[in-house]
Regions:
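Oligomerization/assembly interface segments of phage tail-like spikes and tubes
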Residues: 53-61, 93-109, 118-120, 165-178
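Membrane-lipid interaction segments
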Residues: 28-37, 41, 71, 76-93, ...
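"Short basic amphipathic alpha-helical interaction patches in structured regions
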Residues: 69-77, 116-123, 135, 188
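Homeobox/homeodomain signature
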Residues: 45-47, 89, 163
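Extracellular/virion structural assembly segments
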Residues: 6, 62-63, 79-98, 107-129, ...
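Acidic-leaning, charged glycine-interspersed low-complexity segments
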Residues: 82, 93-96, 115, 125-190
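Small/polar-rich, solvent-exposed N-terminal microdomains that initiate assembly or binding
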Residues: 1-75
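Short N-terminal helix-initiation segments at or just after the protein's N-terminus
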Residues: 35-51, 111-119, 176-191
Length: 192
């Protein structure tokens, strides 16, 4: 979700002057629950409605990725900076997993949806790579690839004039990550 914290919408008047700038809120929420909340708030009381645009994301699945597997018994070592210099930290190799995420953006007009689309898609060609400090004690900072697999849009343009229009953009992502085992502490062998 942090990757999409800075999505903003600009509304302009007929002269092209920016009249409003909206930071699009994001929450951890499945698409169905987010839509149910929007619809419920739209029908129960006209004076209290959910503000659009808004975004939600959810983890859809985790699968093992054998194509990136490392030697199971391989270990990484690092000096223990939190203790005396005679200790060593060790950790077995991580296990590769793919994490499938879905990002949903709900808007009430096509222009807002297009602006969100334009702030996300250009960074994924089709993948975006970030360096993450996953295990600070071991100084493990791998490059993590996030792949944009799909983009779809739904428009509920049918209905009477009292029905709120919903345009839903759905982005499917796959994060190529790792699960790391525990870090163990041991002593340094000074002579054999």
């Amino acid at each position: 979700g942090t990757l999409f914290n800075d999505i903003n919408i600009q509304r302009r008047n007929s002269a092209g002057v920016i009249t409003e700038q909206i930071k699009v809120p994001i929450e951890y929420s499945a698409k169905d629950k987010m839509l149910l909340h929007i619809r419920r708030m739209s029908t129960t009381d006209a004076s209290v409605q959910t503000t659009l645009p808004r975004m939600g994301f959810v983890l859809n699945g985790i699968t093992y990725d054998g194509t990136r597997k490392l030697n199971t018994l391989g270990q990484v070592y690092a000096a223990n900076t939190a203790a005396s210099s005679s200790t060593l930290l060790k950790q077995y190799n991580p296990v590769p997993y793919n994490f499938d995420f879905e990002l949903t953006a709900a808007v009430d007009n096509a222009e807002d949806g297009a602006q969100i689309f334009e702030q996300i898609v250009p960074f994924f060609t089709p993948e975006f790579t970030v360096s993450v400090n996953l295990v600070p004690s071991m100084n493990v900072k791998p490059d993590i690839s996030i792949i944009l697999n799909s983009t779809t849009t739904e428009d509920s343009y049918e209905g009477d004039f009292t029905t709120r229009r919903e345009i839903i953009w759905t982005f499917g992502f796959q994060l190529k990550g790792y699960i790391y085992p525990d870090v163990k502490s041991g002593s340094v062998t000074k002579s054999v």
